[in-house]
Structure formats: C-alpha cells, structure tokens
Amino acid sequence: GPMGIMGPRGPPGASGAPGPQGFQGPAGEPGEPGQTGPAGARAGEDGHPGKPGRPGERGVVGPQGARGFPGTPGIPGFKGHNGIDGIKGQPGAPGVKGEPGAPGENGTPGQAGARGIPGERGRVGAPGPAGARGSDGSVGPVGPAGPIGSAGPPGFPGAPGPKGEIGPVGNPGPAGPAGPRGEVGIPGISGPVGPPGNPGANGITGAKGAAGIPGVAGAPGIPGPRGIPGPAGAAGATGARGIVGEPGPAGSKGESGNKGEPGAAGPQGPPGPSGEEGKRGPNGEPGSTGPAGPPGIRGIPGADGRAGVMGPAGSRGASGPAGVRGPNGDSGRPGEPGIMGPRGFPGSPGNIGPAGKEGPVGIPGIDGRPGPIGPAGARGEPGNIGFPGPKGPSGEPGKPGDKGDAGIAGARGAPGPDGNNGAQGPPGPQGVQGGKGEQGPAGPPGFQGIPGPAGTAGEVGKPGERGIPGEFGIPGPAGARGPPGESGAAGPAGPIGSRGPSGPPGPDGNKGEPGVIGAPGTAGPSGPSGIPGERGAAGIPGGKGEIGNPGRDGARGAPGAVGAPGPAGANGDRGEAGAAGPAGPAGPRGEVGPAGPNGFAGPAGAAGQPGAKGERGPKGENGPVGPTGPVGAAGPSGPNGPPGPAGSRGDGGPPGVTGFPGAAGRTGPPGPSGISGPPGPPGAAGKGDQGPVGRAGETGASGPPGFAGEKGPSGEPGTAGPPGTPGPQGIIGAPGIIGIPGSRGIPGVAGSIGEPGPIGIAGPPGARGPPGAVGAPGVNGAPGEAGRDGNPGSDGPPGRGYPGNAGPVGAVGAPGPHGPVGPTGKRGEPGPVGSVGPVGAVGPRGPSGPQGVRGHNGIQGIPGIAGQHGDQGAPGSVGPAGPRGPAGPTGPVGKDSGQPGTVGPAGVRGSQ
C-alpha cells in the first residue's frame, strides 16, 4: 500500500535488564621472579588479617570496548496480516550507560493501542538490482541521553587497564586440593600481553563507557502478496534467541583523537517501575585450561604500592616430609633475571567494588557498518485469535480476481415457502443477456474467520558473509575522579559459567520525542508465494424455483462475508540493509533492570586507543600500619671497599674473648704460593687448665688486608629476626604500557534457545509506512463461501436490449376455470408502449403449466444505459400462499468469483 504518514513516536522502552557480565579479561603478565630468601625454620602460623589499606588512586578510564556480538534472532511469531510499513526513524545518539540498580518488580502493563488502518494492497514488482553501498554519513548532533535498552550481547573484553600499584608481599598460603578436571573448552586465542607486576588492590570502578555504536538498520523487505485479511491474531510468544552469527574481523586501529570537552550531563529521567528479578542460571561446567601463552615482554618495574587489604587467613596446609639435606654448594653470584614463566591460570573474579560517580557524556561514536545477518529462527506456534476491532472505513473496490475453480455441488436445500399465485402468462420471447451490473457497495464486516493452518517453516538461512569491520570510535574524555572506594580483596578467577536463562523484559518507559523521518531503504527481493488456502465447504443447493416474471434490476447487494484467511506464507528473504538515517533525539533515561545471566566467553577484541591520563589526586593520608611481612631475601653482597692506609703496629693486647663468627667474606683472588718452611719440632700433647677470661683488649690499628681464607661450611639458618618497621609510602607508579592487541578469537559456540519470555505489553500503533513495490500476483485462493443474500434492491429502469429470437411454443397448460366468454376481436397492431401502471392486486394463482423446453440463448444485446437508483417502494401486501410448483432446472455454474469484501476492522494488537 502507499506510504502512510509517520505517527507520533511511542514512549521509550523501560530500562532493560543490564547486559550479561563481560568476559574475563586476559590475565596480566606475571611479575619478575624475586630472589629466593632463606628457608625458615618452620612454616609460620597464619597471621590475623590487618586493617584495610587506603584505597588506591582511580585508574585512567580505558578506551571503549569493541562492539558486542549481534543478538540472536528470536523465533518468528505467528504471521499476522501485512501491516503498513512505518518510516524508519533515525537512530538516536548513544546514551550514557547508567549504573546497575537493584532489581525491582514488574510494572503494570499499559493499555494496548489501536491498530493502524491497513493500506491498499499493491502488486509486488520484480526486485531491482542492488544499489552500490553509500558513503558513511556524517556524525549527527549529540542527542539527550536515551533510555537504557534491553540487555545486549556480551561485549568483547577491553584492553588491559593501567598497571596497578604493587602491594606488599603476602604470606604464602597453603596449597589447596586439586579441583576436578573441567570439560574441554574451545581453545582461546592468547590475549594481549599485560603489564608486569604484582596485582594491586581493586581500584575504584572506572567511569562507564559510552554505549556501543548502533548498527545500521536494514531496509524493509518488499511486502509479499496480500491475501484476504482475516482477523488479527494475537502475537505469538516471544521466540528464543537464534544462533549467534559469526563476528566480523576486527577493524584496523584508528588514530588517537584529541581530548574532547566533557559534555553536559543529561537530565535525570523519572524512575520507572522495577522489573521482576529473574531466575538465577545454573553454574556452568568449569572449562579446561587453555594452552599457555607466549612469554610476555618485560615491563617497567612499578613503584612500591600502598598496603592492600589482608586476605582471610587460609587453613594451614599439611606439613611435607623432611627433605634430605644436600651438600653445601659454593656461593654463586646473583644470576640474571630468568625468562618469564608461562601465564598462570586465570583467577576468580574479585568482589565488586562500590560504583563510582557517573562520568560525563562521551562523544558519540561513528556509525559502524552492519554486521552479518543471523540465520532465521524456527517458526513459532500460532497465537490466539484476537477480538474483532471497530469497523474500519470502506476501501476502494478491488480489481476483479481471476476465475476460481468450480465448487462441489452441495446437498439439496430445504424447500422454500410457497409463493403467491401469479397470473399465467404466455411464454415471452427469449431475452438477450444483459450487461454486467454495477459494483455493489461495501457490506458490513464479516464474521471472524477461522485461522488457517500454520504454514511450513522456512529453511534456516545460511550465515551471512562476514561484515566489514567497523571503525573505532573516538575515545571519550576522562571522567571526573570519584571518591576513593573500599579496596576489595582480589580473588582468583573462576571458570566462566554457562549461560543462564534470560531475565524478564522490563516495562515500557516514558514516551520519547518523535524521530526525524529517515530516507526510505532499498527494496528487498520479493518473498515466495503463499500456500493456497483450503477449499471451503460446498454450499447447500436451493430447490428449483418456478419461473417467475423477469424482475427489474435490483439494488446493489451487500458484499459477502469475508472468507477465512489462508495459511501464512513462508518468510521472504531478508532485503539488503538500507543506509542509516540521521540520529534522532534519545528518550529519557530509564532505570536499570535486573542483572542478566553471564554470557559465553568470546574472543578478545583489539585494544582500543588509550584514554587520556587523569589528573593526579592529592596525596592521601598514611594508612594504618599493615601486618608484619615475612623476612625478605638477603640482597647481594656489596663490593669490597678500597683498602685503607697501613697503620703502625700497636702493642699486642691481652687475648680477647672469642667473638661470634663473622659472615663469610667474598672469596678473594688466590695469592701466590709461598715457600714451604722447614717442619717445626712436634710439641708436647698436654692440656692445661682453662684460665680466667681476660678483659677485652683495646682495638688495635687496622692491619694490612689479609688474603682471603678458604670458604667455610655454610652455617645453619638463623632464627627469624624481629619484624622490620614499615618503610615510607612509595610514589604512585606510572601507568604501564598498553599491550599488543591480540589476534581475533574464534567465535563462541552458539547458545541454546532459551525459554520464551513472557508476553510483552502491546505498543502503540506504528506510523503508516511508505508504499511497497507492486508485488507479484499471488496464487488463486480457494473459492470463498457463498455470501449472504443482499437486501432487495429498488427497481431500475427497463433495459433497451434488442429482442431475442422467439423461443419454441410451450406445451398447452391445464385449462383454467371458465370465465365469461367475450367476443373475439381481431388482433390489432401493437400500440406504443405505455407507461408502467401501478401494480394491481395479486389475483388468484392458476395451476402451473408443464415446464417448457428451454430456448436457445439469444444474441447478446447492447448493454443499456445504467439508470439511476429509484427510491424503494413500500412493500406490497402479501397474498395467500399458493400450492408449491415443480422444481426448476438447476442453473449453470457461475463464472465470475465475487468481488473481495471490504477490509475487516483492525483487530486489537496482540501482545509480543
């Protein structure tokens, strides 16, 4: 039909459920191995948790993540009548993502809006050649913040954030028991190399990234041939999500944009009703460990971080068997730092930190190219029949349809009432066939038809070709620094769980401003022809009536009842995507719905542009003293100092007490071999009494440096010294270098079809869309049931056809009652035709004569001029019923099928 005028924009949708949790980012590069400290005498007892340290400085806002996978298409619902295609509005500017709120209850459903008037049926034209792709449009103005949409697909993991502050070394925990072996998952692609260093405490939640770039809306396909409209059926249940299409390849890295001025925050929208909390999904099977990634590049050593929160005391592990003591080895020089080890297992996600303040609105990104079209989902069950709507305006009469198949002869009808006695007249001449009567006026809407059987489901479409990668968006400005939050204890990353069921949809939001009319999209290919409807039941044939006098033209009869709708045709191929329209204003921001389930892990996306560095905050106060750390490893020995000048030899003092053995010195260079002296005489092997301990002698002058002696055996490890005092707080380290972007990952496994969601609230009627191309003529439908008898029409003027050939003389009828015999006169010449006199009273009916032989059809006369409709006369008095006459012959099968009836009233729009 022709394009309708765009109606007012519907109210914005309610806040959708927040998107599923993003994928676990790649694990950071392990830090450099520290030097091995001396072994302790035994494992120390677990210390008590210390006071929480001061939260770290807020990190720099990371770049916007790559666009998420396209959503899976839902199962198509029961096909309704072809509606009027509305003009597609312009996509609004992406709104600022709100903070997740607590799940609320479902709001009360709004009243269903009236359905729009269906447009006239057009004929489907042949699909035109595909046009060349247009150039990307310019970026539209920034609109106000729009409502939060429904939960989108999980996004790609963003680039690794800046390096956190190095926390103090924690006490080694005992080894936990080995977990059960997980099922083999899809091998992941190595993520980008993160900056080295020990993980710092959880930072404050970063500012929310801007919403993803909206995809280009596809153009509406060419409407298929329109059948006789039946009543509007209720919408089927929302289908489950279809299989996720293959993601397109990652686009090339864009150049860094200039830092933009922070935009003004949008107005706070009124809070919508909270949605009902969805069921929690089952825990997924733990995935198997992926292959170890390549060793990363050594990062810049980070500055000392602030003390992190002490983790809970772990249970003490079982003591291992005592090892056999090995021989003492030579003391070697400190070795070079070893090669980076393989990446460790991903840790479980830590506790969620407090939400930071909302950042300013970012610059909207450039529209991305359309993604691949997903395969068509399975066909849904037919919906319930809706209530008939109010009567719509009468449409223009349609063109006469093609000749339908002849119906089966029906059973004999019940006998009709006896007619009035008519005067027996002589058989008149065979009249010529009159011209076709005028089209009757549209009748009242027919009864609601029985819905036809569901059509066969279309074949599942093949996955579309990989889309052109979209351009990277301009990084948004850095958000204002939020207040320091409590540091959360970083726990180990757990396995990614399986996808849970979708949460219930949120209620509709407030009404937004109408969008600007976008350019009409290109026409898609025509859909396949629908399945012909079933043949209707044959009508009951009427009894043979007596041949009456030829009546005058009747008034227009009422159209027949609308036949039952035929089965729905298969879904047509999806048309090519049209160009995106300019952005329209976004509606007010709605409240956040309940949290959605975790999605499947997807491949790591390419790293975006680094965000602008935030301003350095004021230096915080010194936090409380943390728990005593373990004794650090001994550092390498320093170099020997230069020898001092030789002093004069002092007097020998009395022998001093034996001091503690000193630390072994560095092994000096071997001295020259001395000359062997003569052997001395053997001394007497006696032992005297031990004398008293002498007092300590005066320190003598430093003698010349002696040669280094032989290395003594390694001593037993000493007892742990007292804990050292905590050192001063170090400066905050510079953010680490952004890692190399990883290669594109393998697309994730398609999720299973979820449970159908609850029936949504009916939205307002859509605007009248542009007229579609003329469709191909559809398959002839089965002949409809016979229409109801129309009201008797008023008499028209007599026609002026040529007289037909005289028919054969019929058999002589039975003699009537004798009347008075008049004188027989000569037959006069026919006089002029007199005006029609008033209808006389009905005389008594004479006996019917035998049926005459049917005459041949006369030559068709010239159609007479259609007369004006006369006023309907008052009904005459009914005469007494005469005896029933013999049944007349069955008439020939009609040729033309009736004109289609008027379009029935629009039904109440079904729920989604």
Swiss-Prot record:
Keywords: Calcium, Collagen, Extracellular matrix, Hydroxylation, Repeat, Secreted. Residues 431-440, 539-548, 647-656 have a biased composition (Gly residues). It is found in: Secreted; Secreted, Extracellular space; Secreted, Extracellular space, Extracellular matrix. One of its GO terms (molecular function) is extracellular matrix structural constituent conferring tensile strength. It holds the Pfam family Collagen. Residues 1-206, 222-739, 763-912 are annotated as: Disordered. InterPro entries: Collagen, Collagen_superfamily. GO terms for cellular component: collagen type I trimer; extracellular space. Residues 1-41, 124-153, 178-192, 229-244, 295-327, 360-382, 406-424, 474-501, 517-532, 549-612, 622-637, 658-667, 728-739, 763-785, 805-815, 830-850 have a biased composition (Low complexity). Its main location: secreted. Forms the fibrils of tendon, ligaments and bones. In bones, the fibrils are mineralized with calcium hydroxyapatite. Prolines at the third position of the tripeptide repeating unit (G-X-Y) are hydroxylated in some or all of the chains. The keyword Repeat applies. Residues 43-57 have a biased composition (Basic and acidic residues). One of its GO terms (biological process) is extracellular matrix organization. Trimers of one alpha 2(I) and two alpha 1(I) chains. Interacts (via C-terminus) with TMEM131 (via PapD-L domain); the interaction is direct and is involved in assembly and TRAPPIII ER-to-Golgi transport complex-dependent secretion of collagen. Belongs to the fibrillar collagen family. These protein fragments were extracted from fossils. The tryptic peptides required multiple purification steps in order to eliminate contaminants and to increase the concentration of peptidic material. Type I collagen is a member of group I collagen (fibrillar forming collagen). This is Collagen alpha-2(I) chain. It comes from Equus sp. The gene is COL1A2.
